[in-house]
UniProtKB/Swiss-Prot annotation:
This is Ranatuerin-2SN1. GO terms for cellular component: extracellular region. Expressed by the skin glands. Disulfide bonds join C65-C70. It comes from Sylvirana spinulosa (Fine-spined frog). Antimicrobial peptide. Weakly active against P.faecalis X29. Not active against fungi. Shows very weak hemolytic activity against human erythrocytes. Belongs to the frog skin active peptide (FSAP) family. Ranatuerin subfamily. It is found in: Secreted. Its main location: secreted. Residues 23-40 form a propeptide. GO terms for biological process: defense response to Gram-negative bacterium; hemolysis in another organism.
Length: 70
C-alpha cells in the first residue's frame, strides 16, 4: 500500500509540474503575440507619419515654387 501511495504521489507531482510548464509556455506565446501586434501598429503609424511628412514637404516645395515663380 505504501508503494502505491508513493507512486501515485510521484505521478501527481510530475503531472502538476508539466501542467505548470505548459501554462508558462502558453503565457509566453500570448506575450509574443501582443508584442507583434504592437510592432505592427508602430510600423503602420510610422509609415503613415512618413507619408504625411513627405506629402507636406512636397506641397510646401510646390507652394514656394509658385510664389517665387520657378
Amino acid at each position: 500500500m505504501f508503494t502505491l501511495k508513493k507512486s501515485l504521489l510521484l505521478i501527481f507531482f510530475l503531472g502538476t509540474i508539466s501542467l505548470s510548464l505548459c501554462e508558462k509556455e502558453r503565457d509566453a506565446d500570448d506575450d509574443e503575440v501582443e508584442v507583434i501586434k504592437q510592432e505592427e501598429k508602430r510600423g503602420f503609424l510610422n509609415t503613415a507619419m512618413n507619408t504625411v511628412t513627405n506629402l507636406a514637404g512636397t506641397l510646401m516645395d510646390k507652394a514656394k515654387c509658385k510664389i517665387r515663380g520657378c
